[in-house]
């Protein structure tokens, strides 16, 4: 029997890559041959091959470069990426191409259309990205994590890694927990400057009553460590790391999360059941704000946009949440979790492949 073939296109940030990996691993268990298109200078270059997935790296720059020369280079690199991905698809002939959003999906989606290979796109945010907006015009299927982003698109959630889904539910994890309240701080895989600046002050204000596990981002450890040391002196109520390798362990440890509100982060926090303070990344479409809003409306989280993100406000919010309140918030977060998202996406891909004539 000839194995069905899938190319997944995802790169740049964990929010695109980790859902893609969840889908890839699930499709492999279904007997599919899966390959990956990404970029060689971002985290997928290290992460994806570790899963045993054949990975092709495209030479491409983002759309948002400034300056005439940089914009010309970006256009040239996009055209080059179209040709590279076209060649790969013509040679390997996948049954489906799945784009997970981000700028790399643009040229690869165009190449799939040129090769007459069915294209499926997945929109992770509550506000559609520019690339997916254009790709939706000729994609065979449009999948979305949240309702109402695209009219008539199927809602499938954001695929989540199995180890995160395996975290014990709040009723067993949190109900009898005692001791200092545990604060998990995540600025994304690349870190967040404002979170790194504010949290040492918060840790100093709350010393003795709270403990902190802070992911500072690549290259920021030494600088942030110096700030914590100067603020907390001999206090040992914090742990700093550049990157948390096993985020499921961190989620299971935490009572509260302070983080950005990327779509995948929102989905993971809901699936685990964790209260949160969200600090949306400032973008003109405010997509991270809209991602976080349903959890705030449920009473499961608090949103502090960057102009309002101060040590005083963070400390005030944390001190107003006792363990009983945190347990209630955690249970509320779980009510909007879509824990079968990976299976939903897998089902959509298999259905399309079975209904496509070659």
Curated annotation (Swiss-Prot):
Q: Which gene encodes it?
A: murG
Q: Where in the cell is it found?
A: Cell membrane
Keyword NADP carried by entry: no
The family database entries (Pfam families) matched by this protein are listed as:
Glyco_tran_28_C, Glyco_transf_28
Tell me a Gene Ontology molecular-function term this record carries. Answer: UDP-N-acetyl-D-glucosamine:N-acetylmuramoyl-L-alanyl-D-glutamyl-meso-2,6-diaminopimelyl-D-alanyl-D-alanine-diphosphoundecaprenol 4-beta-N-acetylglucosaminlytransferase activity
Which lineage is the organism of this entry classified under, starting from the top rank? Bacteria, Pseudomonadati, Pseudomonadota, Gammaproteobacteria, Candidatus Palibaumannia
Q: What does this protein do?
A: Cell wall formation. Catalyzes the transfer of a GlcNAc subunit on undecaprenyl-pyrophosphoryl-MurNAc-pentapeptide (lipid intermediate I) to form undecaprenyl-pyrophosphoryl-MurNAc-(pentapeptide)GlcNAc (lipid intermediate II).
Q: Which domain of life is it from?
A: Bacteria
Please identify the protein, giving its name as recorded: UDP-N-acetylglucosamine--N-acetylmuramyl-(pentapeptide) pyrophosphoryl-undecaprenol N-acetylglucosamine transferase
Residue spans making up a coiled coil are none
């Amino acid at each position: 029997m000839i194995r069905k073939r899938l190319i997944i296109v995802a790169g740049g940030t964990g929010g695109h890559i980790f859902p893609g990996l969840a889908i890839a691993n699930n499709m492999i268990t279904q007997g599919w041959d899966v390959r990956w298109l990404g970029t060689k200078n971002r985290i997928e270059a290290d992460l994806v091959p570790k899963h045993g997935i054949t990975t092709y790296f495209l030479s491409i720059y983002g759309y948002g470069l400034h300056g005439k020369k940089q914009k010309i280079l970006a256009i040239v690199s996009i055209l080059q990426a179209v040709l590279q991905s076209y060649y790969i698809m013509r040679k390997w002939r996948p049954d489906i191409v799945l784009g997970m959003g981000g700028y790399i999906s643009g040229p690869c989606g165009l190449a799939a259309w040129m090769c007459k290979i069915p294209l499926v796109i997945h929109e992770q945010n509550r506000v559609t990205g520019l690339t997916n907006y254009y790709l939706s015009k000729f994609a065979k299927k449009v999948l979305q994590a949240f309702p109402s982003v695209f009219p008539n698109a199927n809602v499938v959630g954001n695929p989540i890694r199995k180890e995160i889904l395996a975290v014990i539910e709040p009723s067993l994890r949190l109900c009898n927990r005692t001791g200092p309240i545990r604060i998990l701080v995540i600025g994304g895989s690349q870190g967040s400057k404002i979170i790194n600046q504010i949290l040492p002050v918060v840790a100093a204000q709350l010393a003795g009553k709270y403990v902190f596990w802070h992911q500072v981002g690549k290259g920021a450890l030494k600088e942030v460590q110096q700030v914590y040391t100067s603020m907390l002196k001999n206090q040992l109520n914090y742990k700093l790391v550049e990157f948390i390798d096993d985020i499921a362990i961190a989620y299971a440890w935490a009572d509260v999360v302070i983080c950005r509100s990327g779509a995948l982060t929102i989905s993971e926090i809901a699936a685990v059941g964790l209260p949160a303070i969200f600090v949306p990344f400032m973008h003109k479409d405010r997509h991270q704000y809209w991602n976080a809003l349903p959890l705030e409306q449920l009473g499961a989280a608090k949103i502090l946009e960057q102009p309002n993100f101060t040590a005083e406000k963070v400390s005030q919010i944390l001190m107003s949440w006792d363990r009983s309140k945190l347990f209630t918030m955690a249970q509320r977060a779980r009510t909007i979790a879509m824990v079968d998202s990976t299976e939903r996406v897998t089902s959509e891909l298999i259905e399309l492949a079975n209904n496509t004539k070659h």
